[in-house]
Swiss-Prot record:
The winged helix domain is involved in binding to DNA in the preinitiation complex. GO terms for molecular function: DNA binding. GO terms for biological process: regulation of DNA-templated transcription; transcription initiation at RNA polymerase II promoter. This is Transcription factor E. Transcription factor that plays a role in the activation of archaeal genes transcribed by RNA polymerase. Facilitates transcription initiation by enhancing TATA-box recognition by TATA-box-binding protein (Tbp), and transcription factor B (Tfb) and RNA polymerase recruitment. Not absolutely required for transcription in vitro, but particularly important in cases where Tbp or Tfb function is not optimal. It dynamically alters the nucleic acid-binding properties of RNA polymerases by stabilizing the initiation complex and destabilizing elongation complexes. The keyword Nuclease does not apply. Residues 5-87 form the HTH TFE/IIEalpha-type domain. Keywords: DNA-binding, Transcription, Transcription regulation. Gene3D superfamilies: Winged helix-like DNA-binding domain superfamily/Winged helix DNA-binding domain. InterPro entries: TF_E_archaea, TFE, TFIIE/TFIIEa_HTH, TFIIE_asu, TFIIEa/SarR/Rpc3_HTH_dom, WH-like_DNA-bd_sf, WH_DNA-bd_sf. Belongs to the TFE family. The gene is tfe. It comes from Methanosarcina mazei (strain ATCC BAA-159 / DSM 3647 / Goe1 / Go1 / JCM 11833 / OCM 88).
Length: 164
């Protein structure tokens, strides 16, 4: 089983399935079990259990086995968790996040922004010229927005992720 005390793994799973889903993962019974059994043993609502299982299945962390009851013909779905690929998933997520941060950093560094003092909008220079430097929402004069602090924060995040 995966180390659920690891901050990174815990944070990643929480972002996928939320707090109730994480509670379900922590208390998940061993072996193949039905969603009803999981709900009964973990105390998590059945709808939440099902939603969590499908999210985990989409991310290749849950395996489902279908069995047909020979008497009734009904299908039973048996679930178990498999986090053997979580390190690979975390690396993919890190690369995706890093790529998005670099794209945003490049955008912020290469554009000039103007904002409404009332907080209505933030516009690119070209958009601001189209509105004659007036807020399209309230008509207030737009002012230059110095995004250097935000650029600095983005650079630190990119650097931290690149070195990790």
């Amino acid at each position: 089983m995966v180390d659920l005390n690891d901050k990174v793994i815990r944070g990643y799973l929480r972002s996928l399935v939320g707090d109730d889903g994480l509670k379900m993962i922590e208390q998940m019974p061993e072996g193949n079990v039905t969603d009803e059994e999981i709900a009964a043993k973990t105390g998590v609502l059945l709808n939440t259990v099902r939603r969590t299982l499908f999210i985990l299945y989409e991310n290749k962390f849950a395996i489902v086995v279908r069995e047909r009851d020979s008497n009734s013909g009904w299908l039973t779905y048996l679930w178990h968790l498999d986090f053997s690929d979580i390190e690979h998933q975390l690396m993919r997520e890190k690369k995706r996040l890093l790529r998005n941060l670099k794209t945003r950093l490049e955008f912020e560094e290469n554009h000039v922004f103007y904002v409404c003092p009332q907080g209505c909008v933030r516009l690119l220079f070209d958009e601001a010229t189209e509105t004659e430097f007036l807020c399209p929402m309230c008509g207030e004069d737009l002012v230059y927005y110095d995004n250097s602090r935000f650029v600095g924060v983005l650079k630190k995040r990119v650097e931290a992720l690149s070195s990790a």
